[in-house]
Amino acid sequence: MMPINNRTVVRTLIATTNAFDIDATLALFSPDAVIHDVSVGKRFIGHAGISDYLKLYFVDYHTQSRLLSAKFKDQGQAQIRVDFTGNFGHEIGLLLLSFDANRRIVHIDADLE
């Protein structure tokens, strides 16, 4: 079994959101994680809030993501740039992910270019 690291978490996040697999995506987050999405002006808190976010902005818009770049600042953070396409057209997303010691996502700051 391949050891889990932040790169694996990022790749898995892209794959599970592209598959619209909300349960598998939520498994990557700590129970009290937060997504702060500046582009929509809201914070989504905990698994319930993140589930709502995924349903609304990924499932309902048929969003597909492609990783453009990733910088891993240390064991606790990653900055990624993602190409989003879906029913809304096309956008480039900028995400700053923070991880806990168990490699679960605890916070995402999200915005669009």
Predicted regions and their residues:
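A solvent-exposed, acidic/Ser-Thr-rich amphipathic alpha-helical stretch
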Residues: 22-23, 31-68
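Hydrophobic pocket/interface hotspot
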Residues: 13, 25-26, 33, 46, ...
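Flexible interhelical turns and helix-capping residues at alpha-helix boundaries
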Residues: 18, 33, 86-88
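A beta-strand edge to alpha-helix "cap/lid" segment located at domain peripheries
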Residues: 51, 58-113
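Short, low-complexity N-terminal intrinsically disordered segments enriched in polar/charged residues
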Residues: 1-19, 23, 27
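Hydrophobic alpha-helical segments typical of transmembrane helices
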Residues: 9, 21, 53-54, 93
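Short charge-dense sequence patches
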Residues: 1-8, 43-48, 103
